[in-house]
């Protein structure tokens, strides 16, 4: 883990976990393929403006640079962060993201077959400096709740067409 030290001060970090879940009328492969294809995330993630594939990636990792549009009260701003797809299996997508200063997000998404579809379940772990935590945690919870609704809508509206 990287730590930034400013004038000898190590920031106080705070961590939180939240989970989101939604039923989707689809198959596991279709949903996993969409989640693991970051080039499609500007269509499903409410904050994402731009997704760029990194030129250099560690072995076995798909690395992207993502630009989000954020708002804090009357202030609108953009952030750019690194997002890595660590692993993709038949039904699990594991990702990690990092944005300065010291903001880390880990996402483990599991897609489980159920009658007439699948259940998409996300577990998000956010670690950030204490002063940023409440804002970042609220933004992440709101964005991921909306993203799951958009994944459901996108996948179900494209059934039989390939996503």
Spell out what each predicted region is:
Residues 31-35, 41, 83-85, 120-122, ...:
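Hydrophobic pocket/interface hotspot
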Residues 24-26, 68-74, 87-89, 101-103, ...:
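Beta-strand elements of well-folded, non-transmembrane domains
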Residues 52-100, 150-158:
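Glycine-rich portal/gate segments that line the openings of hydrophobic small-molecule binding cavities
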Residues 17-19, 76-82, 103-108:
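Short, surface-exposed coil-to-beta transition loops
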Residues 159-163:
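Charged phosphate-binding loop/patch that engages nucleotide di/tri-phosphates or the phosphate backbone
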Residues 11-14, 39-45, 71-77, 98-102:
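Short, solvent-exposed secondary-structure boundary motifs
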């Amino acid at each position: 883990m990287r730590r930034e030290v400013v004038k000898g001060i190590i920031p106080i970090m705070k961590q939180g976990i939240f989970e989101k879940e939604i039923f989707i009328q689809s198959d596991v492969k279709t949903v996993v393929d969409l989640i693991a294809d970051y080039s499609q995330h500007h269509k499903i993630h409410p904050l994402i403006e731009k997704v760029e594939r990194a030129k250099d990636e560690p072995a076995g990792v798909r690395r992207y640079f993502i630009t989000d549009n954020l708002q804090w009260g009357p202030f609108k701003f953009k952030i750019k962060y690194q997002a890595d797809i660590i692993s993709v299996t038949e039904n699990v997508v594991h990702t990690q993201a990092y944005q300065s200063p010291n903001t880390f997000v880990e996402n483990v998404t599991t897609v489980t077959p159920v009658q007439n579809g699948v259940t998409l379940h996300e577990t998000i772990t956010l670690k950030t400096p204490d002063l940023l935590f409440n804002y970042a945690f609220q933004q992440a919870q709101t964005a991921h709740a909306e993203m799951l609704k958009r994944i459901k809508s996108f996948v179900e509206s494209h059934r039989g067409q390939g996503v």
